[in-house]
């Protein structure tokens, strides 16, 4: 007879609490915090991807109400992961450097799930695929690269709501990063002036974009505070590389602000 389901067995608490394996000698007290925070990030990234996939489906089904609800959930998660930076910043540079060497070449740059999030949001770079080419998870990332982005689903949503989206946008090469489109901007200006329901969804997408930029900014400042302008453990330029990634995912929604 099988045992009754418990809190611990349902959530696999024993397995979960055995996943933190410090590598430093001692180990250093602060390494556990570093591991826990990054593992929690990965769990939130998993949930964000789950929500983004759902959001794409909702947009393609023209379900505005549930789409807004899904975006609100993602925004709340983003606020949570931004707040985790506050916890990380309780660690001083000396405390981090006490175990930094134990990380060897491991780096947040190697987070496959965050690269998946970037791809879903339309920020696609072939070099990222090459970086993960030797890993078993490369196939999953390649699939994300080949799939339409959230913005493509949004354009489909606009089409369902009666807006004539140019064929070159609907049929665009989805492996390319998004670039601003004057034609789409003209449509969006009309949306804002005439359709409160759809323009409200546009504003929630702006919130989403801003939320990711806020997290990137806090991440940059945390890295600067901890290691200054040193090279990252994975070989990147550290804070300088992170700062270069603070750019909007949905440029058309930002470009129309001056014309509203």
Curated annotation (Swiss-Prot):
Top-level taxon of the source organism: Bacteria
EC numbers: 1.13.11.11
Cofactor field: heme
Any one GO biological process: L-tryptophan catabolic process to kynurenine
Pathway: Amino-acid degradation; L-tryptophan degradation via kynurenine pathway; L-kynurenine from L-tryptophan: step 1/2
Signal peptide: none
Cofactor notes: Binds 1 heme group per subunit.
Pfam families noted in UniProt: Trp_dioxygenase (PF03301)
The protein's enzyme class: oxidoreductase
Swiss-Prot/TrEMBL catalytic activity: L-tryptophan + O2 = N-formyl-L-kynurenine
Binding site for heme: 219
The protein's assembly and partners: Homotetramer.
Protein role: Heme-dependent dioxygenase that catalyzes the oxidative cleavage of the L-tryptophan (L-Trp) pyrrole ring and converts L-tryptophan to N-formyl-L-kynurenine. Catalyzes the oxidative cleavage of the indole moiety.
Protein known as: Tryptophan 2,3-dioxygenase
Top-level taxonomy: Bacteria, Bacillati, Chloroflexota, Chloroflexia, Herpetosiphonales
């Amino acid at each position: 007879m099988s045992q009754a389901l418990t809190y611990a067995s349902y959530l696999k608490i024993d397995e979960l609490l055995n996943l933190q394996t410090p590598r430093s000698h001692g180990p250093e007290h602060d390494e556990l915090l570093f591991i826990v925070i990054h593992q929690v990030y990965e769990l939130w990234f998993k949930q964000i991807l789950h929500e983004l996939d759902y959001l794409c489906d909702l947009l393609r089904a023209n379900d505005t109400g549930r789409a807004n609800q899904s975006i609100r959930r993602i925004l709340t998660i983003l606020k949570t992961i931004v707040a985790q930076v506050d916890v990380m910043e309780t660690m001083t540079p000396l405390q981090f450097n006490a175990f930094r060497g134990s990380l060897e070449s491991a780096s947040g740059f190697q987070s496959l799930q965050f690269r998946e999030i970037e791809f879903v949001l339309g920020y696609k770079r072939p070099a990222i695929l090459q970086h993960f080419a030797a890993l078993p998870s490369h196939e999953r990332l390649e699939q994300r690269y080949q799939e339409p982005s959230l913005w493509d689903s949004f354009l489909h949503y606009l089409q369902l709501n009666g807006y004539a989206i140019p064929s070159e946008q609907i049929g665009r090469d989805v492996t390319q990063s998004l670039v601003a489109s004057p034609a789409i901007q003209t449509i969006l200006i009309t949306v804002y002036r005439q359709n409160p329901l759809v323009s409200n969804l546009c504003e929630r997408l702006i919130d989403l974009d801003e939320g990711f930029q806020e997290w990137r900014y806090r991440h940059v400042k945390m890295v600067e505070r901890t290691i200054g302008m040193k090279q990252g453990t994975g070989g990147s330029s550290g804070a300088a590389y992170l700062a270069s990634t603070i750019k909007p995912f949905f440029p058309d929604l930002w470009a129309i602000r001056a014309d509203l």
